[in-house]
């Protein structure tokens, strides 16, 4: 028996990259009939970003929660923790962790300097806290960029007589500009937000999505494209084309030159807009349910 835990640092609007571990968490919850905790770390984003206010990050937390709920979670077995609102529950656990994590360790892991505020130095203790909110093991699906925090959590857990959290790294959806960087909420041109209109999605994909195709049609027909670096294909592979046979056909057609970059982008645009049309309606419906999901200390 175990429970699930994942989360989000609310520094901006939700983009499609954020949804990957949440959708996977939903699949795990349905498969194993487990309880789920979703942590919104409004405090961490306030500490880490110079121009961020608590008012802003708290507002983003509630907006991000709507996207999480819209994926189909149920309030009876899913609770949303907001750090600044649920500190009464989190702090006693975080205090146990903080006592067993020294500054030299966090400095080595995160590169902290003398100028780093003490909120950031303490933060790993708060991100660890939901791992032990239930008296049973926890499974955490998350973006690999959060791995350093949970490695420390795993190191400290036995020292407070708790089981080490089990971790599942989720793949990162690349930014529109290229497959090497992850999608970021702070770069509007390289990000597809869950609130984007069909027109905006089409414009962003056509204008900014990095292509693995050739410079002109003639050369593309002759040499074919490279789906391994083509962002549109990677979005289909990671999230938007669940049918493996269809995905393989798109891969082969693009690689052979039969399918052009523009045609590949059209497939992606249609699939993203179809997904977002449904998601945005569910997101609005979630407003009336939000209070049922919020964790009560």
Task: Enumerate the predicted regions with their spans.
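Conserved nucleotide- and phosphate/pyrophosphate-binding catalytic cores
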Residues: 147-148, 154-297
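Short, charged/polar micro-motifs that form catalytic or ligand-binding hotspots
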Residues: 11-14, 18, 139-146, 221-225
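A generic short-segment signal for beta-strand/edge and adjacent turn/coil regions
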Residues: 5-9, 142-143, 201-204
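N-terminal Rossmann-like or analogous alpha/beta NTP/dinucleotide-binding catalytic cores
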Residues: 1-4, 10-129, 280-284
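Glycine- and acidic
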Residues: 5-10, 137-139, 250-254
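Short helix-capping/linker segments at secondary-structure and domain boundaries
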Residues: 33, 133-139, 240-249
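A residue-level detector for conformationally permissive "hinge/kink" positions
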Residues: 4, 9, 135, 169-173, ...
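Positively charged, phosphate-engaging catalytic surfaces used for nucleic-acid and nucleotide handling
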Residues: 78-191, 201, 230
């Amino acid at each position: 028996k175990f429970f699930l835990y994942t989360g989000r640092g609310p520094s901006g609007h939700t983009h499609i990259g954020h949804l990957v571990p949440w959708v996977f968490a939903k699949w795990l919850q349905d498969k194993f009939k487990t309880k789920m905790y979703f942590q919104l770390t409004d405090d961490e984003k306030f500490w880490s970003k110079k121009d961020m206010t608590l008012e802003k990050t708290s507002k983003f937390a509630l907006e991000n929660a709507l996207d999480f709920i819209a994926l189909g979670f149920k309030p009876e077995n899913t609770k949303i923790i907001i750090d600044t609102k649920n500190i009464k529950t989190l702090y006693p656990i975080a205090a146990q962790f903080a006592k067993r994590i020294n500054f030299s360790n966090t400095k080595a892991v995160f590169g902290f300097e003398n100028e780093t505020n003490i909120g950031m130095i303490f933060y790993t203790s708060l991100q660890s806290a939901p791992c032990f909110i239930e008296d049973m093991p926890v499974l955490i699906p998350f973006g690999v960029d959060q791995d350093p925090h949970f490695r420390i959590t795993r190191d400290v857990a036995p020292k407070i007589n708790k089981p080490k959290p089990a971790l599942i790294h989720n793949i990162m959806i690349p930014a529109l500009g290229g497959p090497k960087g992850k999608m970021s909420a702070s770069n509007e041109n390289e990000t597809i937000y869950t609130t984007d209109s069909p027109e905006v999605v089409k414009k962003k994909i056509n204008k900014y999505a990095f292509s693995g195709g050739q410079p002109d049609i003639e050369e593309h027909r002759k040499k074919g494209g490279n789906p391994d670096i083509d962002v549109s294909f990677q979005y289909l592979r990671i999230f938007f084309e669940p049918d493996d046979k269809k995905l393989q056909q798109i891969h082969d057609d693009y690689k052979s030159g039969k399918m052009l970059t523009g045609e590949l982008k059209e497939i992606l645009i249609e699939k993203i807009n179809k997904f977002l049309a449904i998601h945005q309606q569910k997101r609005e419906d979630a407003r009336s349910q939000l209070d049922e999901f919020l964790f009560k200390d």
